[in-house]
Amino acid sequence: MGKRLQSQNRGKGTPRYTSPTHKRKGAVKYRKFDESERKDKIIGTIIDILHDPGRSSPIARVRYDNGEERLILIPEGMKIKDTIECGISAEIKPGNVLPLGEVPEGIPVYNIETIPGDGGKLVRSGGCYAHVITHDVSKTIIKLPSGHMKTLNPMCRATIGVVAGGGRKEKPITKAGKKYHAMKAKAVLWPRVRGVAMNAVDHPFGGGNTQHAGKPTTISRHTSPGRKVGHIAARRTGKR
């Protein structure tokens, strides 16, 4: 009898496949959407800039005028002791948080809410940004980094600017150990071994004198877990 596949082991759940979230600095999201932001603005000061393992961008600790502290995603060009404004009357400049309905068309934004007050869900990776395309009476249309157009409530908040950390991929990873530790921070199993390179006991495509699958690579959605590898329930394969 063969061994369990990686997908079967992952489903069981072990420390090898568990993301080390205990090393994270904390939740990174907007403060509560209260009356101070709905009617005016609140000012905060960046008191520290932190590295968060498993996150592709630096984060900042912000202290607001009311004494509240939060972790936020910062844009390119921000530094310690800089101030940010949060609210409907905030100025249009990098780092400030406003409802989408108050952001002019063509301005880059990030950390966008999908529901007013949810803290920010979209466009949070280092170097990413979306564009405000157009406004309507009860909706705002934004263009995501993928090119997809999304319609949102104009009271959903977003931050002006581009997420910091965009140049992280410009420096090449020249050693396998560097890549190993980078993947370890996100619980990604690396390196990824091809099925045809494994022994027959480890994978349905393994074994043999030459590296070939030896059986159909397109498999049913309802097949047994130990055979579910390759193109699962594929409508078509190959070039389009």
Curated annotation (Swiss-Prot):
Chain positions covered by the region annotation Disordered: 1-33, 204-240
| Residue stretches of biased makeup (Polar residues) | 1-20
Q: Which UniProt keywords apply?
A: Ribonucleoprotein, Ribosomal protein, RNA-binding, rRNA-binding
Q: What GO biological process terms does the UniProt entry carry, in alphabetical order?
A: cytoplasmic translation
The entry lists its GO molecular-function terms as:
rRNA binding; structural constituent of ribosome
Cite the record's Basic residues compositional bias ranges.
21-30, 224-240
Quaternary structure and partners? Part of the 50S ribosomal subunit. Forms a bridge to the 30S subunit in the 70S ribosome.
Q: What does this protein do?
A: One of the primary rRNA binding proteins. Required for association of the 30S and 50S subunits to form the 70S ribosome, for tRNA binding and peptide bond formation. It has been suggested to have peptidyltransferase activity; this is somewhat controversial. Makes several contacts with the 16S rRNA in the 70S ribosome.
Which protein family is it in? Belongs to the universal ribosomal protein uL2 family.
Question: Mind telling me what this protein is named?
Answer: Large ribosomal subunit protein uL2
Identify the species of origin. Answer: Methanococcus aeolicus (strain ATCC BAA-1280 / DSM 17508 / OCM 812 / Nankai-3)
